[in-house]
Swiss-Prot record:
Family according to the record: Belongs to the RecR family.
Zinc finger (C4-type): 58-73
The keyword Cytoplasm appears for this protein: no
Function statement: May play a role in DNA repair. It seems to be involved in an RecBC-independent recombinational process of DNA repair. It may act with RecF and RecO.
Name by which UniProt lists this protein: Recombination protein RecR
Upper taxonomic lineage: Bacteria, Pseudomonadati, Campylobacterota, Epsilonproteobacteria, Campylobacterales
GO biological process, one term: DNA repair
Source organism: Campylobacter jejuni subsp. jejuni serotype O:2 (strain ATCC 700819 / NCTC 11168)
Domain Toprim: 81-167
Entry-linked NCBIfam families: recR
Amino acid sequence: MVKGLEKFNELVESFANLPTIGKKTAIRLAYHLCINNQIDGMKLAHNIENAIRFIKPCEQCGALSENELCEICSDKERNKNILCIVESPKDILTLEESQSYNGLYFVLDELNEEKLEKLKQIILKLNISELIFALTHSINSDATIFFIEDKFKGLNLTFSKIAQGIPSGVNLENVDLISLNKAMNFRTKI
């Protein structure tokens, strides 16, 4: 760090603390905002402040929201009978971008009694008929799915999870063995 440039150094450090931003990129960003484009820098600072002040978890599903209920939970056009369980609000953003799902969500960022009770109340209140698990494939997620399925087996639900296998455009030699095994065992007829 350069002596006499404490504010610049603090900005570089703040950028470097963000995921996927290394020190060189942090320096480039700080320089760009302080020297090349101060207007963008002020706009960025304002947008960051507003996001921190106004974005919070949806009270029902845990998605990012500026209101008590997010746009998804408030949308009357959504399929209210299907609930997709995800690990984080970022997963909702990804699924929404894919435009492949039109139901509701529930963020299960941690498995505890409070979360399970909240999930159960949503299932009962909305008369959910299917839970879709869209969790990162791991032994822990398989255990979580099994646990929730066992806990809610008396609620007349259908349980499913998103398909896993080989990503498009990836050579077989580059696929991990678990994904390859899943792809073979859950193959579809053509």
